[in-house]
Amino acid sequence: MSNVLNSSILHSILSIESESGDCSRMADFLTTYCQGQGLAVTQDDMGNIYVTKGAAAAFPCIVAHIDTVHAITGDGILPVYIGDNVTGINPATMEQTGIGGDDKCGIYAALHCLANLPACKAAFFVDEEIGCIGSGAADMSFFRDCRFILQADRRGNADFVTDISGPLSSDRFQRDVKPLLTSHGFRFSHGAMSDVMALRDNGCGIACANISAGYYQPHQACEYIHLPDLLKTCRLMLDICRTMSRVYRFTPAKRSRPSRKRDFWPSSFWPSSDSWDWTPKAKPCEFCGQLLRDDDGIICAECETFELSSRL
């Protein structure tokens, strides 16, 4: 049912250890589960998984990444439910461990949409946490018959990211989605690197967005998921997929990379004037002093420290 979480599937996802560079456990689970539901499933050489349900002239598409930052211990993860929250425990040591809501919440949201829509596509990417490796090499032909691409890969419960170092979607898409955001308690926001950024930069040609998924304190042992917030995200995504039936074409304006002696700059963190927010809200990196945009979980482009400890 679309109005409740499938606790069995969610529990299974949360119990799986999956680390950047070793996503095979999650990939095997998703392949087996989706094939068991009668869905068309393919996997590319990178390990990315592509799922199609039903037939449509243009599909809604949901994407997620299947790696987490947490190292695989081999002990598994025991999801522990405390009221409306769930966190992780290492069953061997009985110590709290990262539940991996980033992006297991997104994986669940994709499966939730597949279960509740007559026609839908989903893609699950490897190794987002180490630079959008999977989505950066995705089969772009998979998205040619899609209307838009949604991802649930952001902490919190209210952000609808339409800009990652440049817009992810057209004004028409944002205008059409705004009433749905208002009714579900979401707002437009800027964000940091995620798979939809890589898809945009690789020319998917349609509107993309990244959405708060109900997880908090990501990348830490104390990470937890607030289940009502995850359900809130799933309801929004279903509403968008059911309501917004047109194809939302979008091609971003070309941008020039800064002249800098560096092999690779993820576009989310180009150190150029158009991608930095030089406002009083911006905070300096406490490790190197570089001024950062006021955005949770940002990677410092100078010293590559992942998160400021003051934001933990």
Model-derived segments and their meaning:
Residues 291-295, 308-309:
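Short functional micro-motifs and their immediate structural scaffolds
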Residues 95-175, 188, 196:
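Acidic/histidine-rich catalytic neighborhood of metal-dependent amide-processing enzymes
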Residues 296-306:
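Cysteine-rich micro-motifs
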Residues 12, 16-58:
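A non-catalytic alpha/beta surface segment that caps or lines the substrate-entry region
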Residues 187-233:
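Zn-dependent metallopeptidase/amidohydrolase metal-coordination segment
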Residues 217-279:
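His/Asp/Glu-rich mid-to-C-terminal helical/loop segments that flank catalytic regions of hydrolases
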Residues 1-16, 257-263, 268-269:
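N-terminal hydrophobic or amphipathic helices/low-complexity stretches enriched
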Residues 37, 57-119, 129:
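Active-site metal-coordination/substrate-binding segment of hydrolases
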